[in-house]
Amino acid sequence: MKRFASRVLPKSLLVHRANKHAIMSFAESVGLVYFGHVSQRDDDDQLIRGLTLSTSHRDRHYCVGSLYNYDVALVERSDTIHYPGKQPRDHQWLIMQFDLHNAKDLPHIFLGLHTHSDIFYANLFAKFTTLQRAPLGTFGMYDRSFTDRYAIYTTPAESLTVERLFDTEMTKVLAQHFGTLTVEVSDGCLYLYSEHTRITKGLLEAMLQNGIWLAKHIDERAVVL
């Protein structure tokens, strides 16, 4: 019967069902509450914000809870990115948000992959006009395992603060464990993004583990900056 169903159902629906099962299973195992679909017309407090927030995005598999002393939210978000002179491009993100304790005054920071599309970065810089690539290396040489994969973007006036926060040793560890995850710090929250089409419980567990580690690091470092 399952083989017959897989022949009949569209691949996109099969992926959606598998992703839903993975997220619900993960949520149950760690103690998150699963709400499913969230409309943009709902209370703004329920929305996961960050750089992917738009007037056209669609959210599903929304989960919330408190884990390891952090308020955590999870959502699968899809959107079509438009930019003048470029072909529209569909994006789908798995987003995990952590409410930070000591980072209310930190600048907007994005750790982006070099492999992001041109339209993604064009849209990002149009939306956040103060973001620029930080010139790393003031306090030491960054490991190539990090710089070959990531660049850090922030407001130019805050680049030294960002280098102290994301220093050479910390970014080396990040490069070893984060794979293709990207990172944003904005308005007192930490966001981890994955663009894996197929969501697995292992991916979700890795995002949670890495997110808690990074949130603790940011909170500890923010106190002395």
Where are these regions (language model features)?
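Charged, low-complexity intrinsically disordered regions
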Residues: 20-225
